[in-house]
Design a protein with these regions (language model features):
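Iron-sulfur-associated redox domains of electron-transfer enzymes in respiratory
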Residues: 1-132
Length: 132
């Protein structure tokens, strides 16, 4: 199950995430289902660069997800700050705040890329669950 967290994006990635959830792509066949609470999630989808105001919230959200967990960085802004990289209000890319397991590049990434990333994240989650 997947929890989405916007850490300061322009909403381009969110539009593509919504497109990914449409019947055309049917992500539930892969076990992809959005949940409203990080306490019920296995995977965190984080979009956007982390603003200074969101840095603590991102950390708290990460801590609320039960182990094992996988973090996905969706979009170029989350990877490097994107067009906002030199903004005074940024804490930095996502991996400066929490560990990231899967990166999905693009501005914004296509739904197919997001699905591919989630499938990779679920495979990693299965490996983590199988580990002693």
């Amino acid at each position: 199950w997947v929890f989405h967290l916007n850490s300061g994006s322009c909403n381009g990635c969110e539009i593509e995430i919504v497109a990914t959830l449409m019947p055309r792509y049917d992500p539930e066949r892969f076990g992809i289902k959005l949940v409203g609470s990080p306490k019920h999630a296995d995977v965190i989808l984080v979009t956007g660069p982390v603003t200074k105001k969101m840095a603590d919230r991102v950390k708290r959200t990460y801590e609320q997800v039960p182990d094992p967990k996988v973090v996905m960085c969706i979009g170029t802004c989350g990877e490097s700050g994107g067009v906002f990289y030199d903004s005074y209000s940024l804490a930095g890319p996502i991996d400066d705040v929490i560990p990231v397991d899967v990166y999905v590049s693009g501005c914004p990434p296509r739904p197919e890329a997001i699905i591919h990333g989630v499938v990779k994240a679920l495979a990693k989650l299965e490996r983590l669950e199988a580990a002693p």
